[in-house]
Amino acid sequence: MMNQAEEAKLLEQLEQWNKKDEYSRCIRAIEAIPEQERGYLLTVKLSRAYSNLAVLGDHGEHGTDGEVDGDLIRHAIELLESVRAQGENDPYWNARMGYSCLMAYRSAASAYEYAKHWLALVPDDPAAQKLVRDCEEYLEEEKALELD
């Protein structure tokens, strides 16, 4: 079992790797810990790493090609689902779920629900405000396409 100091050190290291776009390293480090010992926060961080790897790739190798690895992004969502009970009223969980749903399903409807809940939890968060606006724009575009 990891103690609090070890977990804090790992979380700090994960943030460094995340900033350097080293998502695979984050995944390997977290998955080296037995699943039943990971807890809520490490599970959410693991989901973030899978989501970022799916969309961006290590060191931005996907760049802006718009290619998303469907298996990885669905795994990211499964990880978030596994801690839904603890996450439902956590702004960060809703943020990760909103972004992941938007990338996985190319549909803003499910992402919009998480984005709105995130914004309700932290109304002043500019990132939450932006995700809500982005989802609203996507939903308008989807509606316009249906009308064509």
Can you say where each PLM-predicted feature lies in the sequence?
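Solenoid-repeat scaffolds in large eukaryotic assemblies
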Residues: C26, H59, A111, A128, ...
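Residue register within tetratricopeptide repeats
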Residues: S24, R74, A108-A109, P126
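Residues in the short coil linking paired helices within alpha-helical repeat scaffolds
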Residues: E22, L72, R106-S107, E141
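Short amphipathic alpha-helical heptad-repeat segments
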Residues: T43-L46, A108-Y112
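Amphipathic alpha-helical repeat scaffolds of TPR domains
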Residues: M2-E15, Q36-H62, E88-M103, P126-E141
